């Protein structure tokens, strides 16, 4: 089982990153994709991935919250990062109209620019969409035939949004959000509609600690070592064997991100 979304650059992991990675290995997690959300964090994620070349890859991109800082220099730096062997996808990029830390116009500019970089580099995109589905799809769709893959990270949308995303060919990332008996029930009901070859699983650690995890860590911090819990729960709700599902999502992640195969 491969965790496609780990924010290992978070300050919450500053004191024990090595132990976090070791616990993930011990738990049976077969690889980690470290998320970049700004130029600085993308650089840090790449450097961290280089410390674990057989286990970690990273992404390089600018999150919509940080899109107000996008400029030509940002684009050049993301381009440069995309050339490093540790960087397996462009992102986390997309639209977030929930809080609008950057204006919609700034978000759209940064998103479109990153789609262009991914297309030029023939790299997958690691996508974020919140309360922006229609505009997100309008901007993304013209690029899809130019991209090797598109991964919708931390999907929490509606059934119609899921159907749109699947028709467009997107991979669907599911987090421990689905383990929340309050806000995750609607998503839980959608799980059987995701084809086996389109499903990816992720912790989004240190965020989104599964609410049904027992015992919970005293820190209330999520870690990639809890991915097996998400695998077991998702397998049960999809009516599948957990061991099989773990292998399946690992195969999907390796097919999309091709860790260890950059330049081949």
From Swiss-Prot:
Its EC number is 3.1.11.-, 3.1.13.-. Its cofactor is Mg(2+). It comes from the Bacteria. Keywords: Cytoplasm, Exonuclease, Hydrolase, Magnesium, Metal-binding, Nuclease. It is an enzyme of class 3 (hydrolase). The keyword Transit peptide does not apply. It is found in: Cytoplasm. Its main location: cytoplasm. A divalent metal cation binds at residues 92, 128, 153. One of its GO terms (molecular function) is magnesium ion binding. Gene3D superfamilies: Metal-dependent hydrolases. One of its GO terms (cellular component) is cytoplasm. Monomer. 3'-5' exonuclease that prefers single-stranded DNA and RNA. May play a role in the H(2)O(2)-induced DNA damage repair. Belongs to the metallo-dependent hydrolases superfamily. TatD-type hydrolase family. TatD subfamily. This is 3'-5' ssDNA/RNA exonuclease TatD. It comes from Dickeya dadantii (strain 3937).
């Amino acid at each position: 089982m491969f965790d496609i979304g780990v924010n290992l650059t978070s300050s919450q992991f500053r004191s024990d990153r090595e132990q976090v990675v070791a616990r993930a290995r011990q738990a049976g997690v077969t690889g980690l994709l470290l998320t970049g959300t700004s130029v600085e964090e993308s650089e840090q994620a790449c450097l961290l991935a280089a410390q674990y070349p057989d286990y970690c890859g990273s992404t390089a991109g600018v999150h919509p919250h940080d899109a107000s800082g996008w400029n030509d220099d940002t684009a050049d730096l993301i381009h440069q990062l995309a050339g490093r062997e540790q960087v397996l996808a462009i992102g986390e990029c997309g639209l977030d109209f929930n809080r609008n830390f950057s204006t919609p116009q700034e978000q759209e500019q940064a998103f479109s620019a990153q789609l262009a970089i991914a297309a030029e580099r023939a790299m997958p995109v690691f996508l974020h969409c919140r309360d922006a589905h229609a505009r997100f799809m309008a901007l993304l769709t013209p690029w899809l035939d130019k991209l090797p893959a598109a991964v919708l990270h931390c999907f929490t949308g509606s059934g119609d949004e899921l159907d749109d995303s699947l028709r467009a060919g997107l991979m669907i990332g599911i987090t421990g959000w689905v383990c929340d008996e309050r806000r995750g029930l609607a998503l839980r009901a959608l799980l059987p509609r995701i084809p086996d070859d389109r499903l990816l699983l992720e912790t989004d650690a240190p965020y989104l600690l599964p609410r049904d995890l027992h015992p919970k860590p005293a820190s209330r911090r999520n870690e990639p070592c809890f991915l097996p819990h998400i695998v077991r729960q998702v397998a049960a709700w999809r009516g599948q064997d957990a061991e099989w599902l773990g292998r399946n999502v690992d195969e999907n992640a390796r097919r999309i991100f091709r860790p260890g195969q950059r330049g081949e």
